[in-house]
């Protein structure tokens, strides 16, 4: 038993795990989120503040987090772009997104990382629909229904069999993040689903683990109107992906950065787009 534990610790030492926190007005929950992280396996915590109006930045500094501050609210997707860029600059091997609003359980980070460490996955989702009934855990019924419907649509469009696409608890290999053309993605909530479309196009392996649902007053949550717009943007993305896959209308958004660089070098250009 001792040999196995030491072996696991050595394996973890070989992988630099960076947690990224896309933050917006997270002052009430940031401390508890950070406290629950398994710090023995996390090498660095990066928080990107997207123009918060509360004390998020001050608390992040007090906690000693690696802090990056946007000068205004650019959006959830823009926040993630900064998160992943800075994580890769920090030489991360594995990047885990943990929302600082405490809606996802930080103590499950070892389970999120395990499929990547074992080579079974390039991307891991924390699914709220794999475990207990999410509505009994506080998810509004209309969010549950829309989540199920959109997940059904995306599974058929992308050829996957996931229980949930709309989770903010995600882990990536550095190679996966580097291969996707993230700069072409939206700065809004649809960013997460664009990442899925890119991952499928590039043949990246996606798996999921069960995580509990947490809904409480301090947790951030999109309104009904925001969720409706989000749903429509997903349907547009699915159509765009279908046109790309069929060859009717190709999109650079779904091409790997390495492939685009090779193509443009052959064309006599010196930079990737």
Which sequence ranges carry the predicted segments?
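Donor nucleotide-sugar binding loop of glycosyltransferases
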Residues: 26-29, 52, 105
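Short, well-formed alpha-helical segments that are part of the catalytic scaffolds
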Residues: 24-39
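Hydrophobic helical membrane-anchoring modules
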Residues: 1-13, 159, 183-273
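A conserved acidic beta->alpha catalytic loop
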Residues: 49-57
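Short hydrophobic beta-strand elements that form part
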Residues: 18-22, 69
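Short beta-strand-to-loop acidic/aromatic patch adjacent to the donor-nucleotide binding site
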Residues: 92-103
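Acceptor/aglycone-binding surface of glycosyltransferases and processive sugar-polymer synthases
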Residues: 70-89, 106-189, 216-228, 232-235
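A short, conserved beta-strand element in the Rossmann-like catalytic core
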Residues: 51, 75, 103
